[in-house]
């Protein structure tokens, strides 16, 4: 018996939408029918994912790479850095406004994001982008010191709350095994590393070093658990774009170290680059897995780690006295990747596919 033979109530018959039915596997007879009316899905603001902050995060990282390259007095480097930084801060302001509105209009959705094993970790991108903006902008705009201090404090508190939830879930075995992804690095490891950069920009070097050490400790605690999951097989398709975060701990750690200790030798940075290459090879070895899923904004997870890798390469070249061309090529390659990500993201936006379905 076809599904349309099931009688629907008069109100249901008059509603345009998608009809589905349940079928008894033994008799092949439909047992029930439901209707999802058109236009009753979640509001687009309620579907705004925290992962969109990864776009800002990657652009900020790229701006930082070009700024470091400008130390070689290459043409246009300062202009490119300023342009990318302006784009990133403008987008950050837009997303912050949208998320504030979402918090007041769709608070239940925000609570769901916070409680979700993966979205909760990705939510840490919000304070991460704020702290990275502080570290990049404050040196050239010291008149905003008080504002930067307040933003950094608020971001660290939010970051700490998210990191506590992630660590407690892992420590108590409450996190489902299929939800273990590299995104879990973001709250405890990323928060400590980027927080250290922000505190250093505020002149709190000692606190920055302490936070840097806490981030390294969190990296050591999480590394075995996450690698064990990655070596066990492919992640679920929706989670595969988060694989880019696996690249982050080593290059970002070295970038922070180079920031905290300006006289750090180039050889130390080379060690960090070598460790970073190991993670890069491991991620590339799984390319069939993460390229088998459709493109989404989640692939911006690759952007900041690669930008950090380029920044460390620039610092190694500058401190080691090596050919400037090496640094220039590194930044250009990362710029090409981010331009590609931006083009694909704009295409999703035009097609109305940037946000998850309602």
Model features per residue range: what roles?
Residues 162-166, 196-198, 221-230, 252-259, ...:
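Alpha-helical transmembrane segments in multipass membrane proteins, preferentially the mid-helix core
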Residues 10-16, 23:
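Acidic, Ala/Val/Gly-enriched low-complexity intrinsically disordered segments
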Residues 99-107, 135-146, 166-171:
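Transmembrane alpha-helix boundary signature
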Residues 83-94, 146-160, 206-219, 267-277:
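Structural signature of hydrophobic alpha-helical transmembrane segments
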């Amino acid at each position: 018996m076809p599904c349309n033979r099931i009688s629907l109530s008069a109100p249901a018959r008059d509603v345009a939408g998608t009809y589905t039915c349940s079928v008894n596997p033994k008799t092949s007879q439909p047992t029930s029918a439901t209707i999802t009316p058109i236009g009753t899905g979640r509001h687009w603001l309620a579907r705004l994912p925290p992962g969109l902050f990864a776009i800002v995060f990657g652009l900020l990282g790229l701006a930082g790479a070009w700024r470091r390259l400008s130390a070689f007095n290459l043409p246009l480097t300062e202009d490119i850095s300023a342009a990318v930084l302006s784009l990133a801060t403008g987008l950050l302001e837009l997303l912050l406004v949208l998320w504030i509105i979402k918090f007041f209009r769709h608070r239940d959705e925000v609570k769901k994001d916070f409680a979700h094993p993966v979205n909760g970790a990705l939510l840490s991108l919000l304070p991460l982008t704020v702290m990275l903006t502080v570290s990049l902008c404050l040196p050239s705009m010291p008149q905003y010191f008080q504002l930067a201090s307040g933003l950094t404090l608020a971001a660290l508190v939010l970051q700490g709350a998210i990191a506590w939830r992630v660590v407690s879930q892992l420590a108590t075995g409450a996190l489902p095994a299929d939800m273990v992804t590299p995104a879990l690095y973001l709250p405890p490891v990323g928060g400590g590393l980027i927080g250290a950069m922000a505190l250093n920009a505020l002149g709190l070097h000692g606190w920055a070093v302490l936070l840097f050490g806490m981030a390294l400790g969190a990296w050591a605690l999480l590394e075995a658990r996450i690698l064990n999951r990655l070596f066990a097989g492919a992640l679920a398709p929706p989670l595969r774009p988060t694989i880019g975060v696996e690249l982050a701990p080593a290059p970002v750690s070295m970038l922070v170290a180079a920031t905290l200790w300006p006289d750090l030798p180039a050889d130390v940075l080379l060690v960090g680059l070598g460790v970073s290459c190991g993670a890069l090879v491991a991620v590339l070895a799984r390319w069939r897995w993460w390229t088998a899923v459709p493109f989404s904004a989640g692939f911006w997870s690759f952007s900041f780690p690669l930008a950090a890798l380029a920044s460390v390469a620039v610092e190694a070249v500058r401190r080691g006295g090596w050919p400037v061309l090496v640094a220039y090529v590194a930044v250009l390659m990362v710029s090409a990747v981010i331009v590609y990500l931006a083009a694909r993201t704009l295409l999703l936006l035009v097609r109305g596919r940037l946000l998850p379905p309602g």
